[in-house]
Amino acid sequence: MALARPGTPDPQALASVLLLLLWAPALSLLAGTVPSEPPSACASDPCAPGTECQATESGGYTCGPMEPRGCATQPCHHGALCVPQGPDPTGFRCYCVPGFQGPRCELDIDECASRPCHHGATCRNLADRYECHCPLGYAGVTCEMEVDECASAPCLHGGSCLDGVGSFRCVCAPGYGGTRCQLDLDECQSQPCAHGGTCHDLVNGFRCDCAGTGYEGTHCEREVLECASAPCEHNASCLEGLGSFRCLCWPGYSGELCEVDEDECASSPCQHGGRCLQRSDPALYGGVQAAFPGAFSFRHAAGFLCHCPPGFEGADCGVEVDECASRPCLNGGHCQDLPNGFQCHCPDGYAGPTCEEDVDECLSDPCLHGGTCSDTVAGYICRCPETWGGRDCSVQLTGCQGHTCPLAATCIPIFESGVHSYVCHCPPGTHGPFCGQNTTFSVMAGSPIQASVPAGGPLGLALRFRTTLPAGTLATRNDTKESLELALVAATLQATLWSYSTTVLVLRLPDLALNDGHWHQVEVVLHLATLELRLWHEGCPARLCVASGPVALASTASATPLPAGISSAQLGDATFAGCLQDVRVDGHLLLPEDLGENVLLGCERREQCRPLPCVHGGSCVDLWTHFRCDCARPHRGPTCADEIPAATFGLGGAPSSASFLLQELPGPNLTVSFLLRTRESAGLLLQFANDSAAGLTVFLSEGRIRAEVPGSPAVVLPGRWDDGLRHLVMLSFGPDQLQDLGQHVHVGGRLLAADSQPWGGPFRGCLQDLRLDGCHLPFFPLPLDNSSQPSELGGRQSWNLTAGCVSEDMCSPDPCFNGGTCLVTWNDFHCTCPANFTGPTCAQQLWCPGQPCLPPATCEEVPDGFVCVAEATFREGPPAAFSGHNASSGRLLGGLSLAFRTRDSEAWLLRAAAGALEGVWLAVRNGSLAGGVRGGHGLPGAVLPIPGPRVADGAWHRVRLAMERPAATTSRWLLWLDGAATPVALRGLASDLGFLQGPGAVRILLAENFTGCLGRVALGGLPLPLARPRPGAAPGAREHFASWPGTPAPILGCRGAPVCAPSPCLHDGACRDLFDAFACACGPGWEGPRCEAHVDPCHSAPCARGRCHTHPDGRFECRCPPGFGGPRCRLPVPSKECSLNVTCLDGSPCEGGSPAANCSCLEGLAGQRCQVPTLPCEANPCLNGGTCRAAGGVSECICNARFSGQFCEVAKGLPLPLPFPLLEVAVPAACACLLLLLLGLLSGILAARKRRQSEGTYSPSQQEVAGARLEMDSVLKVPPEERLI
């Protein structure tokens, strides 16, 4: 018997029921009309159990299967359909109507059991439905909607409605009240108007009418003041009275309200035509041409001022003026007084009404041969080129012809008093008429050079120097009053001026180091109470650095006077060593032969640091005559060749220590430094102590260096120091940090190991180059060397120290497994592992070098095994199933990652569930990413907010889902998509994914109802094996996640449908595969998903004006109307008018009117404005093969032998047109034509006769037209063979 789908009636059973229903009335009717018959043969129930007796017409019976009658008792309730069910005849099945259930449909389904009604509504269970009785303020089928009582706008007069649950509240506009703001409030009810004012009610206010009360204000509260309206004019003062007022006027004003401005100019007080100005006129104050200074004031408005004509002055213009009294003539001009004026007689070189103009004599360009003119008073100076001289550069200089200057010098020609000569401009370090004197000399440290110079010159020092020392005095100049010094301080230049032993000014150029061994030119000079320091250097702006400052020199002398007329100078000092040249003191050159002692001529020296003498990374310092090596610790010695020996503490586990007894205590500022190398995280490094207590203690704790002083907080140095590398440790302490240090210094531990335990126990490792304030505390005796090295400090005692930094033998016993080779790496070891093994001790086997995975899968190492990782393609097939029953249940599964691409809008990516309490899933819902985690502990779980990001686009997407706090029992879960920096938090809390591993692990399903590709899928960092190992590959020690038995292998590789084979793109469009979708790159002129639509670029009306024209390649062109231009005819173009904006160059005429005027260019010109000159033959005017030749700016045609004329337009041999009447030419021409026609007819007859005679033979000559070329015959065709002749 076929099984019916649950909830669907059996068709055969339904048919039986219908037959019963139709035949039952008929049988009843027959039963009532047919007469009773004798008892049936079946009355004795002769048939066997399970069968039914049927009487026959002959009075017998037959036994057959029993008819079903299980529904006869109507066992189904509530209108359910009863259908008999076999094989039991009494069997039946009830098909319930909606709303009921149970074997007999006796149970009414309570639709209210799921509590569908919200907000406290009452649920009423009905047949196959429910009904929610909503509380006040809610509506909807499930009372999910809150009723907005404000929707009907119940609040009047602009009131704001605040919706509540089942109610509303009106916030009324000012001036209204009531539950619905329907009441206009009467603000006059409180009688706000005082002093009998009348109140008028307004909306949200009132107005007091104070007329007739004598008061004013909002409430008629202020008495009216008559002066408040400022009735007095011209800033007069108003005196308040009882119902009246009085104005006090300023002088010059009158009237009851001071409204009258008295006219002081009415009597014409100004003489000689002077202009009278009233002081009461405000327009005469302020501005550029104001008659009165300052601002207008009524206090000074009385009176007048006379503006006198030229030549007069005084209060009333009664005094005549002497114009020369003010000395108006400038620059020594003589003033001559004139009536109402003056005249200046100017000296030479000046001009102008007041001789204020300096006559520029250079305006006449007096300088010749390119000379530059500089104007002077009543003259000029010409700066001539090198080969010219004289006042006007008119004389060619010949003085350097045959000069005897040396090659390094420059000859400068001179022309003076009509005589040609020259001078030699010497290079640095030389002097003399022919640069024969050497000015270069060397200065040694401690041997300064003394010199005397004549007094009276400008106070200054100038020289060139070179040195490698950073400090020292270059030169000093002294006399009875002032002293000037030029020195190097920290390798930079400094100048100091003293006056009577008092420092007046110090100038510095701090930005350039000058101890580089190169020559540098410097100068310091005092001029016009300003001291200026100059340095010529490439690093300066414009190659010159300047520092200057004002100087105020003392007037009294206190220094010991030197001999009259002599100043002294000193070159060098106790520290400076180098070379000087071109030294000038107060402008006087100091030559080496005049200096006396300590002078070494020339500047010869060897660079001290080449080749580099310092080893072990030491830095070489060139000290001019010798060198110094600044050694990197722990190296020492003149060339850093020696190393301060290190000491190994605790070698072999034996406690070690060293103690020092200081001869004297360190100063208030203490610096402790040493080199440290260790792999131990704890141990005592150094401790100051006295006989009773410990002072400063430096020790290792948890790999960090700590320094402790009693009574002060500990100092912890950042970072870890126990990495086995050598580190320089330097600690500095101030006077307020250290009190009583003690004279004993314990290093590496105390004599008794137990005494070191509070600070981590005895130290194990290496210490080297221990210093206190730069002084050594050596663990072993140091060899004697030069005094530049740090000195030793204190006595020494040591126990179990090993010289050098010696490592423990970490390879004994051998820690490497599987044949690894052990190498000692200072208190550590390194195992070189053979193939297929890795790890610190080669204990971890590598599986992937054996290539256990077949392409396209790749092998990925996992703990105790490997996984074949690959991309896989799924096509709505069965999902890939995996199990983590072999995975360690102790491993934390705090997240998963998955890569996929699909265009499905509904699909499962990953799904696993352990009952209803634990599970994880990722899916695509409506084209967006969805997911969630249920982690037990009675929590509802965490769900990704919807809608999630869109992912059904065919592109690869990478999802990472992880716990925010993996170590916690429950945590938020975070999701990263495609490497986003900010994750999305799932709503809710859940625990980890431990239910996916261990013996009770659940099945993990991938790609269920999914079409697309999966990439790497990992749980807790362990990938799932989408690909299987190659046959015969050795399995790993543990298979963490395995394929579920019976799961078919997926299709490896990501392969989309062949959407571009054949290409769906029309009209030569290029198909682009987008994974289960395609896109067409259409050619010009086509568009649409398949390039099926012809592009009309003019359809969108791109042209703002004019007409749009389509090109065959799909482009459009806007053809603009007059007055507009641009690609889309948007730009207004001014009309072209010959008299307005069209200018034709070189005399070419402008033709045409607005808007299209243009230029008609003359011969030889071209361009829009005839601005381009053309070559005469550029247009080639010659005809009939003539050659154009340009001659004198015009073209000339050279014709061949058959033509002539200006343009070769006339053919030679043809009669020229004659100046005869037309008839005299036409008649002879007609006769000639008739004669030619007759001759042609005769020739044709003869040719026909000749052709007939040649029939039956082939003669190529017969195919030719007599007297003509072969290709000119347009009637007869040449046979192919004839073309070869």
Swiss-Prot record:
Q: Which UniProt keywords apply?
A: Calcium, Cell junction, Cell membrane, Cytoplasm, Developmental protein, Disease variant, Disulfide bond, EGF-like domain, Gastrulation, Glycoprotein, Membrane, Repeat, Retinitis pigmentosa, Secreted, Sensory transduction, Signal, Transmembrane, Transmembrane helix, Vision
PROSITE patterns reported for this sequence: ASX_HYDROXYL, EGF_1, EGF_2, EGF_3, EGF_CA, LAM_G_DOMAIN
The illness linked here is: Focal segmental glomerulosclerosis 9: A renal pathology defined by the presence of segmental sclerosis in glomeruli and resulting in proteinuria, reduced glomerular filtration rate and progressive decline in renal function. Renal insufficiency often progresses to end-stage renal disease, a highly morbid state requiring either dialysis therapy or kidney transplantation.
Give the positions annotated as glycosylation sites: 235, 267, 438, 478, 669, 690, 786, 800, 836, 886, 926, 1009, 1141, 1158
Consequence of substituting residue 654 to P: In VMCKD; uncertain significance
In the record, the effect of residue 629 to S is given as: In FSGS9; moderate loss of function mutation
Extract the signal peptide range: 1-28
Q: Which SUPFAM superfamilies match?
A: Concanavalin A-like lectins/glucanases, EGF/Laminin
Lineage start: Eukaryota, Metazoa, Chordata, Craniata, Vertebrata
Q: Which GO terms describe its cellular component?
A: apical junction complex; apical plasma membrane; apicolateral plasma membrane; cytoplasm; extracellular exosome; plasma membrane; protein-containing complex; subapical complex
Which region ranges are annotated with the description Interaction with EPB41L5? 1249-1285
Q: This chain belongs to which protein, by name?
A: Protein crumbs homolog 2
Q: Which cysteines are joined by disulfide bonds?
A: 71-82, 76-94, 96-105, 112-123, 117-132, 134-143, 150-161, 155-170, 172-181, 188-199, 193-208, 210-220, 227-238, 232-247, 249-258, 265-276, 270-306, 308-317, 324-335, 329-344, 346-355, 362-373, 367-382, 384-393, 400-411, 405-424, 426-435, 579-603, 609-620, 614-629, 631-640, 766-805, 811-822, 816-831, 833-842, 1013-1054, 1060-1071, 1065-1080, 1082-1091, 1098-1108, 1103-1118, 1120-1129, 1138-1150, 1144-1159, 1161-1170, 1177-1188, 1182-1197, 1199-1208
